[in-house]
């Protein structure tokens, strides 16, 4: 029940409906099932919307309508009396929060319109007004609100800012690291610290590898709920725990024993094959068979009796026995077919090899790890202190501050817990432990609503942990009193062809070992409507592989990205879709695993005329040519004796010195000085005191004087003005901003330059003043191999989309191409010198000196890199986590498609047909095989091979070179359409285009039918005007350039938001002005301004008129002076109407129009027409309008019976007025 006050001050009581009971929800589900609605809510959606009073975890598969469920649940809460500001709603991105807010807003508007209860209308209107203040946003945004409000309780000022620029963070980190490094190098334990640095960097001078280690440890700790406690208690957890063979986890030993038993079973299967050859010709056992039987028996015995024969303490002995027992190779060959029986076991043995030696030396690295722990802790504290001093923090800092505030202040925490009716989280699978801790503190323990899908957890690089979702899922299923699990399986996005192939692939691929969830019936995708189940045979998924048999090893490696042949396959399919199916380009999306090395896609698509839009690439802002030129200009202003920057500035388009000029300047050195900078040589060259003054000719001397004068003015201005103004002064003084507009990618270049000025302004506003500090900051960014964010420019809408799989999450597209399926998964992290794990802490490769094991030797030391036991433990977990995330990436990519999905890759056809496993084990690919395969393509081919008897809903097709010729690929059949923006520079263009279309249609009909039917003898003036006047209006037509102009426009902020003035409006205003202009007065700016006030146009159009050009016409041209001299003979904007004979029907028709100006004399007429078209050469417009002026002349001759002796076009669309006689 809610009380409001009406306009008379009287209380209004609103009675809200109670929350639904489980029985009421079941009743609602049954009603929905029996209803005749075309789109029904599923039983699970209804349950997720209306269940209340407990924690709820919604596992929502791709396309299952999770956003719909969230919006409906929020609306239901509001309608039952829960104010919107009492809901905490967390989203993964700002964009998602905006979209969710808009959906709620639309729902509230709709609800207000539907309700007839005045009191409810008032209440809903209040909710609408409160929506903008509601806690709907990212966890980062909420944490900022908490710290801004309660930061004082932990000593944090509310006037802080967020350091979003990674470059700024790295600059501060570098300063802190350098200072701390020097302190540790001079401390009491310096020898241990030096050994630590050498273990990772090789020597103490190059600290880059050690610095990366420290930064990574720091960043990893920041994703935990309490970084300091994690560093103190968990950082060395594995190093303290795993020091003996007995400490090896049981799970790892079980995997080894499982590999041994699997090897024995596979070997037995191979020996039972008919062609194996168990017996010799004499009937006795073959030597091969005897050897293999021994292996089978011993492996089985050792597995069965492991605890008795070996145990954990004898694990190293088991490894030696197995290594000596099995052959060194992986394969057993039967009838020329190779079976990789021993491959998995060899990989497991490698993991445990040299364990005894490793454990002997592992204890020596513990003091190094303690030093590392101390350094990272000290670095974390020092870095935070610097940020507190600057009052500038990272998002993780703010989140930890918020956690600290809520943990240490019971009253604040309880106020939030009492305030929030429910704590709702979207994309819960992508939460990290820091965010989970914050959510726990906000909740009262039984009011959490979490929506996500563990199969779409793909942000491990942001320290997202899918196990948070997984643990909740298990806990709620085992203990329903803790919470309820609701599964949304119905997919409302994709056709059955996409759903079936997704289910087929992941039911054979994903389980808890690899993928973190068993893809069983409760996780499989189900079509949400009957329309999705209608079959389309041409939409069956395709695995298209370029056959690399003929490459002879010359094909690009996986690291080199997608090949030209693969892109050509994609282009061929797109052309087929576009030509044969009429699929618009914007319905097609290409998904890639990373943004790098995709230039070949754009290049190839350009060759075939396929428009493409990318979501960006690597950050290369500071490496763009125009920005590098400006930075070198600023460096020169700051220090002219910087030769590198000075040469770059001289060679730039701003001053255009060539190699010959620079060589002449370089020879003007002072013989008395050993070293002489270029700036000094320029100064000597100007005053003629260089070593060879005769080389400085007059032209070069003039250029040098201009340069020195300009540089001097810039240096003077740099001391007085702001950076922003200095940059714009450079642009204006040397017209550099205008210059780049004439170059390739003009929009991008100008956007980059504009952004440089804005960033300089932002830099100074953040408290850093001066050119020197700005240059230093930029140089530090470059030193740390960082860059600033690229400036985006607007892209065409009708184009194929190219984006990363990560960027596509949450989106959907009719046709999806998953490219580069043969690219190996990045396993860089598992080969680093250290690996971090939340539970185990750090594991490192230790550079041990094993000189003692070698006996007598003359070597001072023998260093060997060893994988310590914690490192091996973390490595195995990281490998499985990486494979699991790649599997989920494939799931995300496939489920983006609405109609059809394509997989594109390359492979050797002959090798891919080799048998990879002797038999399938159950429904899943064998675990060992899934761990070995390192590409999407390998997974798909293995499934196609091992489960070939099933319908997997995708076809494998090899593409040969003969399929990729120009003739085979084909060409787009799309006609080249004129850009409508190129037709707006004058009044006539749009109507001309419309009239030409009409006339073309009429012409075609006249060719097929009797012309008289379509051209009546008598027509009204209004009818004739609609048909013919557009062709004859005195307004120019655009000259369309051979290449269409780009419509891209960067979206940087600008100060003017004036409406765009169309060129056609300017053309109309010019004609009106020429009609009313009093020619009896001297034509000057004042006369033109007075006349301008009398025309019917808005102020923007009047301002856009070039009055100087009009003045120039009357004052500087003979025709303009002719106007003033013979103004009594002048007629302006004169309408006419004449009869014309149709050449086909031989019928007469009326031709009407308006003539801009003509002079009527006793014996002749002079005709004048104004044109505002843009043009390159006047001859173009002369040819275009010759026939039009002939019609005007004919009309005048018929009317006055006098010849038209002169016909002039007045061209006002160029830089100055031009007169063309026609």
Swiss-Prot record:
Domain UvrD-like helicase C-terminal residue range list: 524-810
Keyword Acyltransferase part of the UniProt annotation: no
Reaction(s) the record says it catalyses: Couples ATP hydrolysis with the unwinding of duplex DNA by translocating in the 3'-5' direction; ATP + H2O = ADP + phosphate + H(+)
Annotated GO biological process: double-strand break repair via homologous recombination
Keywords: ATP-binding, DNA damage, DNA repair, DNA-binding, Exonuclease, Helicase, Hydrolase, Isomerase, Nuclease, Nucleotide-binding
PANTHER family: ATP-DEPENDENT HELICASE_NUCLEASE SUBUNIT A, UVRD / RECB / PCRA DNA HELICASE FAMILY MEMBER
Name of this chain's protein: ATP-dependent helicase/nuclease subunit A
Species of origin: Streptococcus pyogenes serotype M6 (strain ATCC BAA-946 / MGAS10394)
UniProt gene name: addA
């Amino acid at each position: 029940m809610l009380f409001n006050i009406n306009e008379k001050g009287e209380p209004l009581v609103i009675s809200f409906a109670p929350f639904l009971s489980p029985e009421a929800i079941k009743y609602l589900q049954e009603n929905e099932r029996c209803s005749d609605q075309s789109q029904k809510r599923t039983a699970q959606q209804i349950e997720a919307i209306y269940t209340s009073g407990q924690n709820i975890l919604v596992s929502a598969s791709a396309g299952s309508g999770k956003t719909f469920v969230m919006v409906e649940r929020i609306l239901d809460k509001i309608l039952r009396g829960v104010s919107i500001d009492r809901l905490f709603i967390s989203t993964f991105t700002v964009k998602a929060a905006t979209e969710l807010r808009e959906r709620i807003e639309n729902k509230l508007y709709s609800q207000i319109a539907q309700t007839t209860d005045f009191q409810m209308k008032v209440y809903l209107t209040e909710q609408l007004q409160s929506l903008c203040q509601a806690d709907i946003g990212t966890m980062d945004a909420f944490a900022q609100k908490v710290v801004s409000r309660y930061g004082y309780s932990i000593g944090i000022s509310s006037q802080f800012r967020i350091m979003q620029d990674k470059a700024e963070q790295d600059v501060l980190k570098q300063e802190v690291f350098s200072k701390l490094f020097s302190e540790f190098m001079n401390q009491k334990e310096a020898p241990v610290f030096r050994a630590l640095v050498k273990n990772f960097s090789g020597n103490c001078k190059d600290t880059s590898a050690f610095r990366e280690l420290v930064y990574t440890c720091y960043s990893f700790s920041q994703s935990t709920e309490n970084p300091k406690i994690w560093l103190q208690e968990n950082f060395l957890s594995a190093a303290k725990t795993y020091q003996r063979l007995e400490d090896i986890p049981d799970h790892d030993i079980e995997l080894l024993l499982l590999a041994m038993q699997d090897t024995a079973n596979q070997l037995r299967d191979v020996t039972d094959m008919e062609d194996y050859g168990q017996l010799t010709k004499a009937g006795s056992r073959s030597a091969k068979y005897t050897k293999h039987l021994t292996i089978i028996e011993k492996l089985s015995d050792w597995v069965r009796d492991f605890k008795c024969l070996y145990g954990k303490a004898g694990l190293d002995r088991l490894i030696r026995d197995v290594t000596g027992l099995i052959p060194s190779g992986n394969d057993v060959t039967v009838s020329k077919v190779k079976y990789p029986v021993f491959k998995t076991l060899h990989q497991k043995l490698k993991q445990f090899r040299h364990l005894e030696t490793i454990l002997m030396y592992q204890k020596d690295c513990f003091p190094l790890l303690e030093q590392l722990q101390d350094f990272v802790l000290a670095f974390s504290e020092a870095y935070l202190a610097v940020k507190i001093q600057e009052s500038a923090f990272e998002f993780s800092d703010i989140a930890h501050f918020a956690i600290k505030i809520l943990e240490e202040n019971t009253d604040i925490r309880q106020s939030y817990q009492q305030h929030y009716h429910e704590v709702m989280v979207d994309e819960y699978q992508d939460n990290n432990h820091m965010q989970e801790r914050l959510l726990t503190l906000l909740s009262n323990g039984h009011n959490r609503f979490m929506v996500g899908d563990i199969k779409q957890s793909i942000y491990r690089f942001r320290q997202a942990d899918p196990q948070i979702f997984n643990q909740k899922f298990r806990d709620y299923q085992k203990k329903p009193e803790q919470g309820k699990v609701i599964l949304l399986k119905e997919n409302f996005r994709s056709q059955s062809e996409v759903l079936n192939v997704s289910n087929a692939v992941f039911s054979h691929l994903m389980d808890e070992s690899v993928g973190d969830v068993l893809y069983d019936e409760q996780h499989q995708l189900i079509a949400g409507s009957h329309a999705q189940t209608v079959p389309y045979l041409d939409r069956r998924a395709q695995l298209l592989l370029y056959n690399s048999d003929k490459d002879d090893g010359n094909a690009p490696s996986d690291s080199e990205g997608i090949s030209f042949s693969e892109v050509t396959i994609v282009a061929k399919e797109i052309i087929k879709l576009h030509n044969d199916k009429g699929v618009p380009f914007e319905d097609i999306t290409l998904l890639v695993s990373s943004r790098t090395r995709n230039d070949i896609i754009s290049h190839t698509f350009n060759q075939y005329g396929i428009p493409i839009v990318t979501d960006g690439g690597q950050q290369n802002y500071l490496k763009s040519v125009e920005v590098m030129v400006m930075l070198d200009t600023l460096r020169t202003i700051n220090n002219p004796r910087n030769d590198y920057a000075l040469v770059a500035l001289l060679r730039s388009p701003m001053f255009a010195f060539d190699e010959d000029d620079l060589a002449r300047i370089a020879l003007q050195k002072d013989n008395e000085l050993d070293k002489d900078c270029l700036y000094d040589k320029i100064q000597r060259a100007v005053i003629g005191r260089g070593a060879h003054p005769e080389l400085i000719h007059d032209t070069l001397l003039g250029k040098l004087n201009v340069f020195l004068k300009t540089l001097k003015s810039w240096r003077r201005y740099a001391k007085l003005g702001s950076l922003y103004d200095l940059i714009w002064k450079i642009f204006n003084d040397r017209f550099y901003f205008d210059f780049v507009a004439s170059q390739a990618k003009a929009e991008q270049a100008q956007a980059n330059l504009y952004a440089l000025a804005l960033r300089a302004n932002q830099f100074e506003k953040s408290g850093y003043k001066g050119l020197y500090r700005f240059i230093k900051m930029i140089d530090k960014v470059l030193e740390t191999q960082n860059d600033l964010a690229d400036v985006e420019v607007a892209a065409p809408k009708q184009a194929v989309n190219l984006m990363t799989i990560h960027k596509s999450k949450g989106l959907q597209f009719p046709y999806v191409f998953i490219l580069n399926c043969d690219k190996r998964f990045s396993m860089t992290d598992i080969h680093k010198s250290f690996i971090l794990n939340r539970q185990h802490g750090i594991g490192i490769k230790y550079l041990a000196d094993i000189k003692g094991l070698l006996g007598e030797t003359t070597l001072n030391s023998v260093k060997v890199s060893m994988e310590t036991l914690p490192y091996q433990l973390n490595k195995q977990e990281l490998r499985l986590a990486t494979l699991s995330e790649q599997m989920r990436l494939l799931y995300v990519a496939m489920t983006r498609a609405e109609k059809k999905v394509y997989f594109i890759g390359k492979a050797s056809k002959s090798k891919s047909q080799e048998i990879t496993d002797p038999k399938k084990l159950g429904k899943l690919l064998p675990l060992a095989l899934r761990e070995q395969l390192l590409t999407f393509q390998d997974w798909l081919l293995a499934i196609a091979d091992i489960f070939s008897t099933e319908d997997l809903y995708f076809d494998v097709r090899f593409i040969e070179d003969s399929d990729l010729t120009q003739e085979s690929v084909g060409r787009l059949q799309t006609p080249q359409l004129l850009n409508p923006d190129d037709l707006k520079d004058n009044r006539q263009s749009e109507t001309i285009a419309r009239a030409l279309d009409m006339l073309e249609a009429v012409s075609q009909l006249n060719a097929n039918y009797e012309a008289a039917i379509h051209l009546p003898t008598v027509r009204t003036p209004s009818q004739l005007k609609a048909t013919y006047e557009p062709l004859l209006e005195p307004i120019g037509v655009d000259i369309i350039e051979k290449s269409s102009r780009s419509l891209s426009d960067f979206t940087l902020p600008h100060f003017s938001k004036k409406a765009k003035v169309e060129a056609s409006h300017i053309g109309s205003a010019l004609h009106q002005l020429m009609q009313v202009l009093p020619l009896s007065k001297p034509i000057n700016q004042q006369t033109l301004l007075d006349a301008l006030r009398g025309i019917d146009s808005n102020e923007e159009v009047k301002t856009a008129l070039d009055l100087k050009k009009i003045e120039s016409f009357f004052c500087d041209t003979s025709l303009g002076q002719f106007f003033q001299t013979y103004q009594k003979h002048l007629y302006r904007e004169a309408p006419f109407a004449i009869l014309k004979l149709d050449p086909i029907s031989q019928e007469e028709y009326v031709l009407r129009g308006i003539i801009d100006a003509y002079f009527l004399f006793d014996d002749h007429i002079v005709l004048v027409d104004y044109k505002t078209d843009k043009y390159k050469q006047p001859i173009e417009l002369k040819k275009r309008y010759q026939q039009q002026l002939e019609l005007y002349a004919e009309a005048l001759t018929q009317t006055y019976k006098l010849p038209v002796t002169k016909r002039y076009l007045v061209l006002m669309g160029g830089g100055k007025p031009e007169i063309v006689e026609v």
